[in-house]
UniProtKB/Swiss-Prot annotation:
GO molecular function list: translation elongation factor activity
Native species: Syntrophotalea carbinolica (strain DSM 2380 / NBRC 103641 / GraBd1) (Pelobacter carbinolicus)
UniProt entry keywords in alphabetical sequence: Cytoplasm, Elongation factor, Protein biosynthesis
A matching Pfam family: EF_TS
Primary location group: cytoplasm
Name of the protein described by the UniProt record: Elongation factor Ts
Protein family according to the UniProt entry: Belongs to the EF-Ts family.
Residue ranges of the region described as Involved in Mg(2+) ion dislocation from EF-Tu: 79-82
GO CC aspect terms: cytoplasm
Subcellular location: Cytoplasm
Native organism taxonomy: Bacteria, Pseudomonadati, Thermodesulfobacteriota, Desulfuromonadia, Desulfuromonadales
Length: 303
């Protein structure tokens, strides 16, 4: 299969590996992008796991907390200038208020609801803002946590670049210490970017894929085959400690895991506390901009 400039460009964007390494990996994988990513990872040439969520979409992530309810909303636009536009900010915050008050089931339901202070629906207000601001605006996603017993914390990092919701279940949800830990955990999640709540959420397929990468690297580094499995056992636990929130080292006190911090709060307030769920929005994650200039740059490397 012929390896094109756009294929090399896509693989390099996904992995951060060099152009020639990407071209070689694509040749070995017969043009299959995902197989090429694995080839580069096994050779230690890829930062794919950490760069997989790089994105270039602009706009805002906003959050709102009212009582036991918390929401995140992401609205995208064409340029980063829009994030500073008062009309755009008012629209995004208005959408968050609609979500808190009405708790719609999905985007379609949200867009059909009345927009505050107007006689328009959310969808009609979106169209109105497109005409006013002069850029395409996309109401991309939202999430709403509403806990029966406990607290929901909201954290927005930077100018709407990252948003986090954390839900703590406890019979003492009104205790300020619960709210304080929720805010700190939300900041931890913004910084540490866990992929799962706990190891039970990691599929067997993902675990086996990680083990195979570890096995290949260990054997290629000259480690005796008889001790490779022991090495993998240690490395897979380290992997869980990196990607699972409850097993991560707490950023405020790295000597403690997140699980231990939550347990300690329960002892302090005299009631069980459970970190039941979280969500992290990163502005534009999964939305890539085309870069024709970059494709042209690598064209000569693929001839």
């Amino acid at each position: 299969m012929k390896i094109t400039a756009s294929m090399v460009s896509e693989l390099r964007t996904k992995t951060g590996a060099g152009m020639m390494d990407c071209k070689k990996a694509l040749s070995e994988a017969d043009g299959n992008i995902e197989e090429a990513v694995d080839i580069l990872r096994k050779k230690g040439l890829s930062a794919a796991a950490k760069k997989a969520d790089r994105a270039a979409a602009e706009g805002l992530v906003v959050g709102l907390n009212e009582g036991s309810c918390g929401v995140l909303v992401e609205v995208n636009a064409e340029t980063d200038f829009v994030a500073k536009n008062a009309n755009f900010q008012e629209f995004t915050n208005g959408v968050a208020k609609v979500v808190v008050s009405s708790k719609p089931a999905d985007l379609e339901a949200l867009k059909a609801l009345p927009f505050p202070g107007t006689d328009r629906t959310v969808a009609e207000e979106q169209t109105h803002q497109i005409a006013t601001i002069g850029e395409n605006i996309n109401l991309r996603r939202f999430v709403c946590f509403d806990v029966a017993q406990g607290a929901v914390a909201v954290y927005i990092h930077g100018v709407g670049k990252i948003g986090v919701l954390v839900e703590l279940e406890t019979s003492k949800g009104d205790d300020e210490r619960v709210a304080a830990l929720g805010r700190n955990l939300a900041m931890h999640i913004a910084a540490a970017n866990p992929q799962y709540l706990n190891r039970d959420e990691v599929s067997a397929e993902v675990v086996e894929k990680e083990k195979e990468i570890m096995r290949t690297k260990a054997l290629e580094s000259g480690k005796p085959e008889k001790i490779v499995e022991k090495i993998i056992a240690g490395q897979i636990n380290k992997y869980f400690g990196e990607v699972c929130l409850l097993e991560q080292a707490y950023v405020i006190d790295p000597d403690l895991t997140v699980t231990k911090v939550v347990e300690n709060l329960g002892k302090e307030i005299g009631a069980e506390v459970t970190l039941s769920r979280y969500v992290r929005f990163q502005l534009g994650e999964g939305l890539e901009k085309r870069s024709d200039d970059f494709a042209a740059e690598v064209a000569s490397m693929t001839k």
